[in-house]
Amino acid sequence: LIPMLYAIYIKADIKNTFSLRLPKLRYILGGFIVWFGGYFIINITTRILISLFPEGADVLEAVNSSVMMDSFFASLIVVALIPAICEEILFRGFLLGAFKGESKKSKIWAVVMVGILFGIMHLNFIRIVPTAILGILFAYCALATKSIWTSVFMHFLNNGFSVCALYITQKYLRIAIDTNVTYTMPPISSILV
């Protein structure tokens, strides 16, 4: 909201400043492919960081648990939909629009800077690097498609997948506790970015 109000205040062209054009379907599909490939990179990066800094796993798990709600749909809205829209307007809309120039080099720097800022904004040490990688992918796709809706879709997909994974994990853990059966499950919730 603040970036939008500021853009209105400085009389910026809202549609161009925030790249609000609707993308073609092939760009959305391309965004899905980029996210899917990037998901493995951020998952591997997260696992490496957790193996190097095991104490970070507890903090990561606490953060993930704190944002989840009893209602799956409420969690989907709060953890996936709202951040996808608000964070993309700020990072891939306002900041990317402010940083990018006309040259290829300035666009590359803008994509990297916005990605790094996105990672830093998530504060948790274990999440900074994977989230920065994700932010770079989002920024690249927003710039390449000239639409933040591609990155909004990717962001929602990423966080929505994490919400689903957390709920599935919690369901199986409850079943295991209720039936006194032990399941070996990977730390799926560690992917919430």
Pin down the residues of each PLM region.
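Membrane-embedded alpha-helical segments of multi-pass membrane proteins
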Residues: 1, 77, 129-137, 157, ...
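Alpha-helical transmembrane segments in multi-pass membrane proteins
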Residues: 1-9, 30
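Juxtamembrane helix-loop-helix connectors linking adjacent transmembrane helices
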Residues: 15-86, 176-182
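Hydrophobic residues within alpha-helical transmembrane segments
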Residues: 33-34, 82, 113-117, 129, ...
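Membrane-interface helix/loop boundary segments of multi-pass membrane proteins
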Residues: 86-113, 140-147
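Membrane-interface helix caps and helix-loop-helix hairpins in membrane proteins
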Residues: 120-126
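C-terminal membrane module of polytopic membrane proteins
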Residues: 156-193
